[in-house]
């Protein structure tokens, strides 16, 4: 039997542990933890779940519809009229050459899925969408489809006709190598990176963009996106030549593409001695305007350059572009008009693709700075807008594309207020990055 003193000590210890247990239980209830249950999100992420589930359903719908076709979905064929384009471009009339292109009359305008061969610059995005959706959901059928459509692109490892082989192969084979690595996938990426390096001119310090047009050596701001393939090739091989070439291109582009306010020209063409031939646009409102997707390409590219090099000049460039974008947006939901200098009217098309690219870039940028909360919050606003009924398609509609209301190339009368496969890609990538930063498990939403 316990002595009276020992009994008192025992009672006090028992009371202490009972109080401690009750306190721990209260804290567990207060913060939503349970020893038998997985961690649950503290906020309402219904919009996030809806975006992921819609994307998975739309991609499965598209896979079923296109079957074994090797032509990959890019957009929906839409109509337009030249008067509308003139108003958007502040022109009294379009040139004869433009007018000849601006006549896509078709019985199925607005509903016909627009598919292209593997040599189209967007060919890597549909397989990439499948890979990202698989990573987000763990759905094995999406992985199987991703493998199938990625394999279609295997001949591109030998293609040298465009800088866009970075888009085409990194978004497809790059994701494949992350999620289902194989020696053949790795070698295809390295071969493609070598071909991209073959477009680099050391006198100019840039990778050539297009092989068409009257320009001498065109470089477009979009080209900043192809540098990720070269960074990846350095990681795969241990050879810094790919990375150093990419950073040289980025420095030259920083010097010549950007204005004092950190807005970017779309196209800079160089003379053979490295001097600038001309600065202009091919997809923006005017040579002097700020084409929305072009600004997003620049933000994304310089964020990647800082991530890989830790060179502070690239961080400053990315932050200044981010500041420009957040300052100049005219819309309440932050999804930009197709050009930041476009007419501010209800009729002016938005560009959901620019919003998705910006969101993805800002999420990564938020992880590279000391206090990235403002970037993360702005990216969250963009993603919530894109995940709303105003932009996220209903399952079974929109010909299987995930997002609505993107603009491809308005001055060329191409893909205006329509879905685009690369809008879907960067939307899914942004959702994935958002979940990784917030440590959200899709299964527990």
PLM regions and their residue ranges:
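Positively charged n-region of N-terminal signal peptides that target proteins for export
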Residues: 11, 18-21
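Short, low-complexity interaction segments enriched in Ser/Thr/Pro/Gly
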Residues: 8, 16-17, 36
């Amino acid at each position: 039997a316990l002595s009276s003193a020992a009994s008192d000590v025992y009672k006090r210890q028992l009371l202490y542990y009972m109080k401690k247990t009750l306190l721990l239980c209260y804290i567990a209830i207060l913060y939503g933890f349970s020893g038998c249950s997985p961690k649950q999100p503290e906020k309402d992420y219904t919009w996030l779940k809806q975006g992921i589930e819609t994307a998975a359903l739309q991609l499965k719908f598209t896979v079923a519809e296109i079957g074994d076709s090797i032509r990959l979905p890019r957009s929906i064929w839409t109509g337009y009229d030249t008067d509308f384009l003139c108003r958007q471009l502040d022109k009294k009339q379009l040139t004869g050459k433009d007018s000849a292109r601006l006549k896509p009359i078709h019985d199925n305008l607005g509903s016909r899925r627009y598919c292209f061969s593997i040599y189209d610059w967007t060919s890597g995005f549909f397989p990439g969408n499948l890979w990202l959706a698989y990573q987000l959901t763990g759905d094995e059928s999406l992985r199987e489809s991703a493998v199938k459509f990625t394999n279609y692109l295997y001949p591109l490892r030998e293609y040298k006709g465009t800088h866009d082989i970075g888009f085409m192969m990194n978004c497809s084979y790059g994701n494949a190598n992350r999620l289902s690595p194989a020696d053949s996938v790795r070698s295809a990426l390295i071969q493609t990176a070598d071909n991209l390096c073959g477009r680099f001119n050391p006198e100019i310090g840039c990778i050539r963009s297009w092989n068409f047009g009257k320009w001498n050596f065109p470089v477009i701001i979009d080209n900043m996106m192809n540098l990720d393939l070269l960074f990846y090739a350095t990681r795969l091989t241990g050879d810094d030549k790919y990375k150093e070439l990419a950073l040289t291109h980025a420095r030259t582009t920083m010097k010549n593409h950007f204005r004092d306010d950190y807005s970017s020209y779309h196209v800079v063409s160089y003379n053979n001695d490295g001097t600038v031939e001309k600065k202009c646009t091919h997809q923006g409102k005017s040579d002097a305007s700020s084409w929305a997707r072009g600004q997003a390409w620049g933000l994304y590219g310089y964020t990647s350059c800082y991530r890989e090099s830790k060179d502070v000049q690239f961080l400053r460039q990315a932050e200044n572009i981010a500041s420009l974008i957040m300052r100049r947006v005219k819309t309440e939901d932050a999804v930009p008009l197709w050009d930041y200098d476009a007419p501010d009217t209800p009729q002016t098309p938005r560009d959901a693709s620019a919003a998705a690219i910006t969101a993805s870039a800002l999420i990564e940028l938020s992880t590279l700075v000391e206090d990235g909360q403002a970037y993360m919050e702005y990216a969250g606003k963009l993603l919530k807008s894109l995940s709303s009924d105003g932009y996220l398609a209903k399952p079974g509609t929109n010909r299987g594309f995930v997002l609505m209301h993107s603009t491809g190339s308005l001055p060329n009368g191409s893909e205006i207020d329509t879905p685009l496969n690369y809008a879907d890609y960067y939307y899914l990538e942004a959702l994935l990055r958002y979940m990784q930063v917030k440590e959200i498990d899709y299964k527990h939403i």
